[in-house]
Amino acid sequence: MKGQETRGFQSEVKQLLQLMIHSLYSNKEIFLRELISNASDAADKLRFRALSVPKLYENDGELRVRLSFDKEKRCITISDNGIGMTRDEVIDNLGTIAKSGTKAFLESIGSDQAKDSQLIGQFGVGFYSAFIVSDKVTVRTRAAGASIDQGVFWESAGEGDYTIADIEKETRGTEITLHLREGEDEFLNDWRLRSVISKYSDHIALPVEIETKNKSEEEGEEDTVTWEKINKAQALWTRGKSEITDEEYKEFYKHISHDFTDPLIWSHNRVEGKQEYTSMLYIPSQAPWDMWNREHKHGLKLYVQRVFIMDDAEQFMPNYLRFVRGLIDSNDLPLNVSREILQDNSITRNLRNALTKRALQMLDKLAKDDAEKYQQFWQQFGLVMKEGPAEDSTNKEAIAKLLRFASTHNDSSAQTVSLEEYVSRMTEGQDKIYYITADSYAAAKNSPHLELFRKKGIEVLLLSERIDEWMMGYLTDFDGKKFQSVSKADESLDKLADENKAEQEEIEKQLEPFVERVKTLLGDRVKEVKLTHRLTDTPAIVTTNVDEMSTQMAKLFAAAGQQVPDVKYNFELNPDHQLVKLAADISDEVQFADWIELLLDQALFAERGTLEDPNQFIRRMNQLLLSEKA
């Protein structure tokens, strides 16, 4: 061996290895699935590269994975004749984890073994799963197209470091030898290995072969070795749906996603006609750990005429459906397709539209057939789905049907109410869908803006996530009915309160001088001062006009570091509230000012959750409490 050196693992690799050995031990047989899956990927990459450089096959185009074991040496060897690796690639792939956010992810792992195994599985362990059953792993590899003396040797005990060196290797591809720990002898058994491969890797399009030694009947002659194929070795998506079991669909999902959990639902679809393609789409049962990371890769596996082209082809799914996993096999795209060609291509656009509709139909069917399962989906991916109305105007109505909200109809923060349910419960004469946005469910639920609606028995949607205000800027109507924020000043809301119009007008006339005094006092700090009959228990509220930026939108701008225009509120006073009546009767201008400022601060605090000068508010409150006692 030449160029031998010992290198230290990246700290995240050391941490992952320790976590994996302890957390995944109960499901240790998955090491074989992961290593065979990697070998399959290596074959896919070679096929793709060989489209433009055929000599990479090195006169050996029959791609396969081979498995052998040695009971005496207590070793299992998995070898492939795929793309192989250079020395630099070995260091990058086996010594480091390139995923952004890995450190934060590993820090989130706790002491709950069952939960940890799910999280680590979701992260995708790949090659490192070899250490679940091994106390030493040896790798011999050579990249396709490299010379025989450019082979690479890698070995580690899965602790702090690894050894790497240059070797000669006749054949291209990768050979991984696992030196089993004590107590792992169950895997030194032909039947056991066959059963694991059948369970996890039957769907792999690559032949998986196991070594069979045939005893020679003649004395002095050596035993012969043959290789027996033990999987179907046919791409799963090319088979008829009726031939595929649910277990095979689930295992294929785990193969392409490297997720350990079963998918929630899936759809296998073959289209013939103007465009010919096969798609296999999966909705995961849990969100990927790095879904909100901007560097998170997403998209479908792309095949053209059954030849693997690329992973993470994001051009076939809109961003709000980035959690959808699966593949598309197109007969219409060229074999030499690149990401750049996909970007501006009518075939791609048509496929994207069709696949988007298919994914939305899957979710719509789930919502109708199994509300409990759909709720599980919503808890994991609801926030992402809320990006849909802004991103996909074509499918806005279909997306809107899939949205779920908390509402005044249910005394719960759970987002379970659909817009169709809301519309079905609308009161007689109601022509709008009412909603409120706030910083929290409690703030929305207890907002004074809801008082009139509770009195009238009108349901209001309670929106309390940061994305909600932005979403409602695009979600303007549903089923022919406009959305209306209850925190906006609007004539239609005033009309709702017009029960005793003559009596209300009389009160307003009597309090005209009071309203003028308040206007004079506050000046241009507020847009308008008026009396309102929308309130029952609250003395005053502030509102914004329909065409102006809302409080929640202003908060979003501020959180994003953008300049926020001044929001001027309408100050609306409840003439039936005792505090307003008391304020109207105060003749002393200083005391009157304190009362009005206090009422305004209360309204602003209820609306924004903060005050510009909380100390002044406390001082006024204390003064009034003391004067009341005197």
Curated annotation (Swiss-Prot):
InterPro entries: HATPase_C_sf, Heat_shock_protein_90_CS, HSP90_C, Hsp90_fam, Hsp90_N, Ribosomal_Su5_D2-typ_SF
Keywords: ATP-binding, Chaperone, Cytoplasm, Nucleotide-binding, Stress response
Region forming the signal peptide: none
MF (Gene Ontology): ATP binding; ATP hydrolysis activity; ATP-dependent protein folding chaperone; unfolded protein binding
Gene Ontology CC terms, in alphabetical order: cytoplasm
Subcellular location as annotated: Cytoplasm
Keyword Transcription regulation (UniProt): no
Domain of life: Bacteria
Region described as C: 556-630
Region (B), start-end ranges: 340-555
Chain intervals for the UniProt region annotation (A): 1-339
HAMAP family per the UniProt record, alphabetical: HSP90
Its job: Molecular chaperone. Has ATPase activity.
Protein family according to the UniProt entry: Belongs to the heat shock protein 90 family.
Subunit details: Homodimer.
Protein name: Chaperone protein HtpG
Taxonomic source organism: Photorhabdus laumondii subsp. laumondii (strain DSM 15139 / CIP 105565 / TT01)
